[in-house]
Amino acid sequence: MKRSALLAALLLLAACSRTDPAAQYASAQKAFAAEDYAAARAQVLGALDGDGGNRDMMLLLARTQLKLGDGDGAQATLTRLEEGGLASAELSRMKAEAAILRGQPQAALTLLGRDNTADAWRLRAAAQNANGNSPAALDALRRGLAVDPRNYALVHDHARFLIAAQDYPAAGKAVETLRQLGPGRLDTLMMAGSLAAKLGQLAAAKQNFSAAADAFPARVEPLTALASLADMEGQIDAALQIVARAAKIAPNHPEVIDLTVLLASEKGDWETVRKTLVGQEATLDPRSANGMSYAEALLRLGHPEQARAMFAQALLLSPQNPYSRLMLAEAQLAVGDARTALRTVQPLSDSVLAGERALDLAVRAAKAANDPSAGALLARLQSPAFKASQQLANAGQAAMVRQDWPAVLAAFGQIPGHENDAEALRRMALAALRSGQADVALSYADRALDLAPRNADNLHMAALVRLESGRDRDQMLRLMKAASQLDPANRVIRADLARAMNAGG
């Protein structure tokens, strides 16, 4: 009798110690509503442990996995639901979103079929973006907005697209709509902060990101945004402290890793860069920030041949990138190929905007190659005129960051030789365009294009001036398409190509 009573008591204790699946499901729903998706996933998985066949719980798990970017997990959950007999248009849309996350945009488009809902158009836009077809993506966003102009997720994706395309007036209208639809939501605060940062309104950006960090303490995105702002303002140590906070929440989050690498690079902590990225070496895009930081880490840690190979690939993929050109020349010099290093760095050192680092590298390469230009390069590096040009170039760059366009024009316009330098002219074209001086902008942009007609950035600027001033549409489209062909991975050019192709004829 005593044994039976003891067994009954143990069974009762075990039953009481089990968490009620319904209670865990309720907690998961609450966490999902609060946009704490990691907590929602943990809670709903716990609920499914006790009620594995619950369809509502599995649907919440799939939605949570999609929010967390876990395409494989979402696909597995959705397959279980299908096998259990669930079939609906919403399920097809969720499968399409999972396919996009898994790198299968064409499968996503097939799954969406003829679905004409706003959410379906949003997913088509995401799939077309993944395909690199920005014009089709923008068209899908606009079609979705025609169906439901107040669909929060769709308005958010449209705002993000417009910011990428640097269409800030239209992006501002989209952000205002987000504020109306969900004033306290994370994506509203983050998008408002992103737009403010792009407009040079750093105080407003910080206010939005700080509000997001306070309201959503379990999310890393507000913290990484604040860290990026601190880095922009030169506060590297403050940025590191914020990233450390984010790492406690989600150490493997891509934004945490990216900022860890960036800040370590700026501090010259190359061993941290190497350790952080060594497991990703095979999949790193050499032209990405992480790819080039890893290559520089290899160079600084005594592996110049590997670094040279990575920088050569980066420059091949993005020939107008000055950093990859500079670092390739550094690596070439490090392996003893001084003459090639001099040829590589020459487009940078010849520019009126040449920095001290580029000119110093040219001097070292010329000396090592016994090139007769070494003396003239050294004389220029040591000259008062070069130092004065450096001050003006730095002032112009600082003005660009704060978007003081008249100051940009004033600074670069005082640099001797700017009228024959494509890089200086392109920056002046942007400043004139943003100042409302379309004719002046066009003259600068076209002169830059004449000087370097195969440069994707110059093609893009010449097209952008025409796009935003509403002139010569055929020429604008030709230039924008040429820029996109030369630099197909450039998201700004892709977004502007979409705007150009969707602009009225």
Protein language model features and the residues they cover:
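Positively charged n-region of N-terminal signal peptides that target proteins for export
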Residues: 1-4
